[in-house]
């Protein structure tokens, strides 16, 4: 197995960061509170980060999502990878504040802002989609 050189886990939740700092003891892993990596990294992977909306207004939440992606993209040297809950037609936010993105539109937005973007879906997880944005394409 290849050696991992370093890992930084970033989260907004103080509780999550404290748990990780106190429970995970790898010399190559550090944890920080924030919206994006505190320094340049090869890969930024956001898993579930953008799914929980703090508003019921889709356009407002999508601005927040794109703002977060832009900040992470600035720190990503190779790739930005993120997943979202997805829907077939129009982006929406559920009653319990889960954001569902229309994947073709999100892919187009990412391609216009960042460059080559691949959308990955799996029939086993029909409401989940992963977006992979690569630099230098």
Feature-to-residue mapping (PLM):
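Conserved acidic residues
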Residues: 41-42, 78
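Conserved beta-strand signature within the Rossmann-like core of class I S-adenosyl-L-methionine
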Residues: 69, 73-86
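Charged helix-capping and loop-helix junction motifs
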Residues: 59-68, 99-102
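Class I S-adenosyl-L-methionine
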Residues: 91-137
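Class I SAM-dependent methyltransferase SAM/SAH-binding core
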Residues: 1-37
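A short SAM/SAH-binding and catalytic strip from SAM-dependent methyltransferases
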Residues: 42-62
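Short "lid" loop at the C-terminus of a central beta-strand within the Rossmann-like core
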Residues: 51, 84-90
